[in-house]
Amino acid sequence: MENNNKNYSHYLHSGYAHPITRSWQGDKVILKSQLIYPIFVTDLINTKTEIKSLPGQYQISSDLVVEFLRPLVEKGLKSIILFGVIISGVKDEQASSADKRESSPVIKSIELIKNEFPEILICTDLCLCAYTDHGHCGVLTEEGFIENEKSIIRLGEIALSFAKAGAHVIAPSDMMDCRVGQIKKVLFQNGYGGRVAVMAYSSKFASSYYGPFRDAAGSGAKHGDRQAYQLPIASRGLGLRAALRDEAEGADFIMVKPAGPYMDIIREVKDHVKVPVCCYQVSGEYAMIYHASVAGGIDLKSGVMESLISLQRSGCDIFITYFTPQLLDWLKL
């Protein structure tokens, strides 16, 4: 006689046997509007150079950035984040090249992009490391230590320059204490508080996955490292504390960086903050997936999509990824 005492709730296959019912099992689909593409803009002229450690990514002079973006905009690109790269200009202790129009590739690029593609959301990375002669993310004391208060004042000045040029989102990546509050104060004092958002690199860890990026941005520290201000990789508590602090100081968006190895932090942050959470799939993550596909270890599209769906499942709302050009081809909406 057949046993009718089965617990049918343990049988799962029927709930995802059809493509449509499979789609119902996920919370969301990833949209093109959730993607932010990182762009490295240089102070050179008429130059586009592939970054060896980031295949398929380029350092682009600001005069070429519009034509570089045009085919991506036609495919549905909605958002970018600009990183300045000083090659021919001067780097100094105060990061002077960051906010002088004649020397800042970011300011020049903002103006050009905004004029040609007014619908594009322009985010600007905000840090001193790419512009200082020592390569650290803040102003240093004579002894070589970070001077936090002077650093956040300088960051506020640069943020205001980016806002005046037309940036929509300022994204401080420096990891100075309390810089979000200083940036928000400067923006409000100058009439930009209600128009320019702050996306804080809040839970940013002192990761080994940043290597290709530092090649791209020319932002490696000349001495020491950044472990005194970027978060310890083992610390879950600091990851949450930094996010809660930045939210309390007025951050409109919170970022976790890197992404894949820190999905527990993404979930923790998502469960505690009331603002959207962004994750940065950093250069080392990109390189691993890219080279695994080149070696035949994984299918590129499947690997990229799985990585982003996993990040979304962990709580990510916005994705900064170097795979954006491919995703614009793969995603329908």
From Swiss-Prot:
Binding positions for 5-aminolevulinate 1 per the UniProt entry: R214, R226
Cofactor note: Binds 1 zinc ion per monomer.
Top-rank lineage group of the source organism: Eukaryota
Chain ranges passing through the membrane: none
GO CC annotation: cytosol
Any one GO biological process: heme biosynthetic process
Subunit structure, interactors included: Homooctamer.
Protein name in UniProt: Delta-aminolevulinic acid dehydratase
Gene: alad
